UniProtKB/Swiss-Prot annotation:
Component of the ATP synthase complex composed at least of ATP5F1A/subunit alpha, ATP5F1B/subunit beta, ATP5MC1/subunit c (homooctomer), MT-ATP6/subunit a, MT-ATP8/subunit 8, ATP5ME/subunit e, ATP5MF/subunit f, ATP5MG/subunit g, ATP5MK/subunit k, ATP5MJ/subunit j, ATP5F1C/subunit gamma, ATP5F1D/subunit delta, ATP5F1E/subunit epsilon, ATP5PF/subunit F6, ATP5PB/subunit b, ATP5PD/subunit d, ATP5PO/subunit OSCP. Pfam families: WRW. Subunit f, of the mitochondrial membrane ATP synthase complex (F(1)F(0) ATP synthase or Complex V) that produces ATP from ADP in the presence of a proton gradient across the membrane which is generated by electron transport complexes of the respiratory chain. ATP synthase complex consist of a soluble F(1) head domain - the catalytic core - and a membrane F(1) domain - the membrane proton channel. These two domains are linked by a central stalk rotating inside the F(1) region and a stationary peripheral stalk. The gene is Atp5mf. Keywords: Acetylation, ATP synthesis, CF(0), Hydrogen ion transport, Ion transport, Membrane, Mitochondrion, Mitochondrion inner membrane, Phosphoprotein, Transmembrane, Transmembrane helix, Transport. Its main location: mitochondrion. One of its GO terms (cellular component) is mitochondrial inner membrane. It is a single-pass membrane protein. The modification Phosphoserine is found at S3. InterPro entries: F1F0-ATPsyn_F_prd. The modification N-acetylalanine is found at A2. This is ATP synthase F(0) complex subunit f, mitochondrial. It comes from Rattus norvegicus (Rat).
Length: 88
């Protein structure tokens, strides 16, 4: 027989749509709760891509690619105006 998992302990991908509003309200939105969520996300990323037995540069490349895309999105407003210029 399957044991019933409380809604608070379910992961986001395990929550049904009708349970989603109550699941969101059960989350911890205090600064320490948000910091803990970021810490858990960082730990998951680090253990999955960086701290592996046969490590490669792919985990660091993903961070660098995200940085490049983020920087481009931030500077897009300035780059947009220089796109059609013929001369300096």
């Amino acid at each position: 027989m399957a044991s019933i998992v409380p809604l608070k302990e379910k992961k986001l991908m395990e929550v049904k749509l009708r349970e989603l509003p109550s699941w969101i309200l059960m989350r911890d939105f205090t600064p320490s709760g948000i910091a803990g969520a970021f810490r858990r996300g960082y730990d998951r990323y680090y253990n999955k891509y960086i701290n592996v037995r046969k490590g490669s540069i792919s985990g660091i490349n993903m961070v660098l690619a995200a940085y490049v895309v983020f920087s481009y999105c931030i500077s897009y407003k300035e780059l947009k105006h220089e796109r059609r210029r013929k001369y300096h």
